[in-house]
Amino acid sequence: MSSKREIRWGLARIYASQNNTIITITDITGAEVISKASGGMMVKADREKPSPYAAMLAANKAASDALDKGLMAIHIKVRAPGGAGPKTPGPGAQPAIRSLARSGFIIGRIEDVTPIPHDTIRRPGGRRGRRV
């Protein structure tokens, strides 16, 4: 008898801003966090937090923790700050996705979940702008 092992799916959420990259791997419902890591946890200097190298290290750490806990396949959701901030992901998004793919996961789908306003939104700083 060949007993086929059921594949355990999860969600990898990548938040890539200009200041940091945060990777959170949850179960398929998103309710239980299995592992998380950020670029700031991997490097010493603050200026290196948003770097692609820090994002790659963070994705490797989160992936190894999730693989140890039995996760085999993931769907990836990439998010930029959005809203009043930039709508494009930061420099760590691509290396994080590549690192998750190389770590041995089965990749289901990759989607962008950046919040985009459907009307205009008021920028921070007020009517007279940011006074320096």
From Swiss-Prot:
**In UniProt terms, what function does this protein have?**
Located on the platform of the 30S subunit.
> Gene name, please?
rps11
Instruction: Tell me which domain of life the UniProt entry assigns to the organism this sequence originates from.
Output: Archaea
Keywords for this entry?
Ribonucleoprotein, Ribosomal protein, RNA-binding, rRNA-binding
Q: May I have one GO cellular component term?
A: ribonucleoprotein complex
What name appears for this protein in its UniProt entry?
Small ribosomal subunit protein uS11
User: One Pfam family from the UniProt entry?
Assistant: Ribosomal_S11
GO BP annotations of the record are:
translation
Q: Does the keyword Ribonucleoprotein apply?
A: yes
The upper taxonomy is: Archaea, Thermoproteota, Thermoprotei, Sulfolobales, Sulfolobaceae
> Can you state the subunit structure given in the record?
Part of the 30S ribosomal subunit.
* Record-level Gene Ontology MF annotations: rRNA binding; structural constituent of ribosome
* Family, per entry: Belongs to the universal ribosomal protein uS11 family.
List where this protein forms a coiled coil.
Answer: none
